[in-house]
Amino acid sequence: MGNQKLKWTAEEEEALLAGIRKHGPGKWKNILRDPEFADQLIHRSNIDLKDKWRNLSVPPGTQSLTNKARPAKVKEEGDTPAADANDAVTIPRPIPTIPPPPGRRTLPSELIPDENTKNAPRYDGVIFEALSALADGNGSDVSSIYHFIEPRHEVPPNFRRILSTRLRRLAAQSKLEKVSTFKSIQNFYKIPDPSGTKIGVPKPKETHTKLRQANNQTSADSQQMIEEAAITAACKVVEAENKIDVAKLAAEEFEKMTKIAEENRKLLVIATEMHELCSCGETMLLA
């Protein structure tokens, strides 16, 4: 929380004005959180900033004149209503002019009047100059034309929009030829050929040849992928068969060990019986 009793220093006032220029009036919390102004305004709250901005917005002497007019209206009871109205008149508060924040992008409509759009035909000369210099048989896009004109001529900031509109208008008037290609969604413009022949347009035969080559390449790639998949599958089958053989051998070995264990168990039973009989003094004959 801020401390309203502390007198504002020049450094704090400069930080407040700089914060208003950056964030705009009323964005007190944003100004306090901004690392650029946090150190200077560490002892101030958003209410302190609001009150200080209101005091800075009121011209000097306005508040004193308003305060003096109020008691005059109460004491002079015999004056006419017209006189009271004149005494109670307050001077309107001037609206402070705040420059736009540095980070805010100024719209072209705020800088350039509509006269640029109305006077767009005067840019036809530089457009034809750019197309003649670029001399691209397939046409030039808006970006290429703009980057050619911008460093050579003085143009408004919204010239790119004016240029795009003017190119479409000239193409509609048949003063320029608009070229559309299947490789790009952008429109290309060029000066019409006086002989009437079009340059740079691929022939249907060439287009079909390129498509056929692309299809052949795709087929070859697909065949290679199929062969690789078949080889991989065969390797997996061989690996599975090897695992099956190993499992069979393990099962046979387990069966042998089971039989040996059963025979040993039977021999142990016979030996136990013989030991018991011998312990009782009986005679046993072994065949």
From Swiss-Prot:
Residues 233-259 form a coiled coil. PROSITE patterns: H15, HTH_MYB. Transmembrane segments: none annotated. The keyword Transcription applies. Keywords: Chromosome, Coiled coil, DNA-binding, Nucleus, Transcription, Transcription regulation. Residues 93-103 have a biased composition (Pro residues). It is found in: Nucleus; Chromosome. GO terms for biological process: nucleosome assembly. This is Telomere repeat-binding factor 5. It comes from Arabidopsis thaliana.
